[in-house]
Amino acid sequence: MKNKKLIRYTSRDFDSIKADLIDHAKRYYPNSYNDFREGSFGSLMFDSVAYVGDVLSFYLDYQVNESFLETSIEYDNVRRHAKRYGYDFYGRPSAFGILTFYVLVPAAASGLGPDPDYLVRIKTGTKVSATTGATFMLTEDVDFSDPKNEVVVARVNETTGRPTFYAVRGTGQVKSGTLFRTNVNIGSFERFKRIRVGPSSINEIISVYDSEGHRYYQVDYLSQNTIFMEVTNKNSANDGVRSIIKPFVAARRFVIEQDSTGTYMVFGFGSDDEASLNINVADPSSAAIKLTGKNYITDRAFDPTKLLDTNKLGVAPQNTTLTIVYGANDADQINVPSNAINSVKELVYEFPDDSRISSALVRSVINSIEVTNDKRVVGNTATPSTDEIRIRSYGAYASQNRTVTREDYESYVYLMPPKFGSIKRASVINDPSSSNRRLSLYVASVDNSGNLVLANDTLKQNTKTWLNANKMLNDSIDIYDPYIINIGFTFYVSVDSSYDKQSVLNNCFSSLSTMFAEKMYIGEPLYISKIYKELNKVDGVIDAQNVVFNVKNTANYASSPISLQELVSNDGTYLNTPKNAILELKFPNLDIRGVAK
């Protein structure tokens, strides 16, 4: 032990490592080497070793930081940590809206009303396109024979005055994107098989079948072997319920993983024996607690999604071909303004009875179909930043798949699957005038430019349906639009005489634009001191003297009944945003003005 050399393991940076190397050489090799000049060969060797040590130390520190959600920088790593906390998202969310369809239908022989044989039904899957190039797909049938449709006379016989054609108006819901089909060849058995489906823009897996016709089901995690399937209710005419939800054991299942490189499916490692249990409906008794050799009961939480007694985590496909149908947006700009959807791209239709109609009149009816959107189609939002993912993941971890607190509801809104659309900002408040636990949920979306807009009715309904799955039975939710208050301001700064005033102003504009790039939250106040602090950090600014706000209510801005006097606090230090409103600096280049003195 007396010959053991002293090594300092705490040296991590370039200078300390080099100093330790020189000290080591002087201490243990005083007669072998004593040239420590900067330009010597020994100095080169010391610098090289210290350089490598510094790089390795940095790499070690970086990787350690990437192991924690709080300190991660890389987007994919933050995303993986968030998934472990229960917050997961994938794909670009779909945009939803209501379209209006028009069709010219020949008049009946009597001239009173349209001929019912030519009242076409536009089927689910029909594709329409917008001026932005985005494709939208019909999610429900548009039946022009519905008596609720508006019918007006479109053409008349000039001689007799009798109607010859009627215009019929119908509506239907659409979602952005289209369906894609891909085939993936699967080789021999592999535990936890992972296959690439497609790009990271996929927002929904529609169906997965193998060559033998077996269907695979998507689950949240592989140990979850029970899904709930929609079954048509044959008694819907009497009880008003269109479908019945029934539990179903999914022996063949998979989970989705997604990062910047693509979308992947991961399977378990079970064999076909697991799928041959012939269990069509899950039986909770198979998951009953088993007591062996003890006279007490341990408190165990019952998981209703795990009703099959197996630990193989699902059947893994082998020596087959998987046919996968998935949905994805085919354009970047899918939030479109009103009247932007104007053409039918791919029509799927049917008539009541093909044997009773004329092919010429059929072509006339089909060619007359027109489409438009009376209201904007929204639902897509920008990919959340790393900071947003961190905040939302903490909320998802605390909510534990149930909605009890205010934060639970807000977190669960952000967890809504992308196939239902996406909410940019959400806020829940208790209704003080309610005695039956009513909650008010305020939601806002964004347009193609990233500016705040009101969510349409379809997106609100999707949000309510999503929340109903996990809310408390006696909670009632009302979804409202918040007031969008567009603000602007003028700042006054003193500039050092040695600096160019215009350059300093440009730097101030750039700094403030970056500050307001991230949209504020509903009910979030704006502290004016933050603007002063940002201005004072700009080189050349001696002091930020004043900031004067104004509310924008002109064209291209949101209309809000809230005045500036209602926003400014009594001491004038912040803008006190109402709980049902959200502040937005919509056009930084126009809404920020500066004066240099």
Language-model-detected regions and their locations in the chain:
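Signature of Asx- and small-polar-rich beta-strand/turn repeats characteristic
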Residues: 1-597
